[in-house]
């Protein structure tokens, strides 16, 4: 700082200048090495021809869709040029791929390098590029396509990217072809926008970053893609996502919004979908998970987990299944599978209730096998509620038979209890065997309210306690209270209707006592 005096005006100018320089350096790092300008602030994009890496990728011209011969020439030129920066392990990985051969890693000799430089200079001149016309051989820190706006097909099928590669904030107006591409180091597609289809089939990633990337125009295809370290899709948006048979060591899909999501036969070491939204189909059929986290995810349609293998702890905590329960037929669930605070749907129509019943029955059996008793009871409740809708509470009577005669009831609307009504009563009385409070309250109400007619019969108002005792004895008659505490002549002098009432009270008590005992057994896991 030399002779600058603290608190002098020039001191503050020095500090501000130093801070600005540091901030500028940081922004260049974030933006892939380019200085941040006012154009960046307004999101003005770079013309493809002004990016030197694009010129190299299209060394012999921009191929049209279907022009595989020109694309192959460009690919071989790119791969042989960057092969000088590949180590032996990377070269071995490249030669093992199905789409590339050993010729893609053959180093350019001096004559071929000179020819490539001449071709680059010619391409630079024809494109009217503002990029550096010279192409060097020193290994770069990164390959940078950041902020480029591609208004045409970007065709990088089978390209090898030997160093950190940036496509941050890049826009692809047409299709983007990365099929079979190999990213040897970190690849960054954060905040990129794919307005057309995006093809990453059979691509190989080391570290992949697609944070807040938008795939909004077509299908994003990652079929058979491999990621050896981690893939980060936080905040990404997919109109349609295909990840069949991918092999990701670790992946994060935090707050991702999917249109349709296809993950059949996918293999994940650790994967997280916290806060993800699945707007349409979500297919994980045959997928394998190490540890999985779906906390607070929302499934709006039909989640398919058939034949999935959850090898590690899996969290469905606070998940919302909006329209249909997940299907876990032939799935293998880990004992650490958690459903805490999950929101489950119930069928509205009997036509769909069968699918709900089957799904909840499967989950109930899975929880029974894992000895997760509370979850088993809860899925049994959901199964019963679905069965009630399937069977219905009341059914229409179209005709009535009386003394051998059939009476049509087309003009008279009559109902008859259906098979679902007992299930509804079972749920009301004890929450399908989960609540011992409900039958206990029912017993007290039966005894208390049932005492009123006996009170009137025995003598109002002095015989209240006698009437209450008689009502309690009836309610708990199965235990033998009435025989032990009530004289036989008391019952003999009752009116006939009160005798019928006492019998109904005893039957009600038997049912409620049974439900109370069942709930106690279930709640405290008594065998």
Place the predicted regions along the sequence by residue:
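N-terminal leader/targeting and pre-domain segments
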Residues: 23, 36-420
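Cysteine-centered motifs
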Residues: 19-20
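Pore-loop/selectivity-filter region of tetrameric P-loop cation channels
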Residues: 419-436, 454-506, 515
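Aromatic (phenylalanine/tyrosine) cluster motif
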Residues: 7, 11-14
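Alpha-helical transmembrane segments of polytopic integral membrane proteins
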Residues: 450, 513-517
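Segments forming glycine/polar-rich beta-alpha architectures that bind adenosine-containing cofactors
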Residues: 434-453
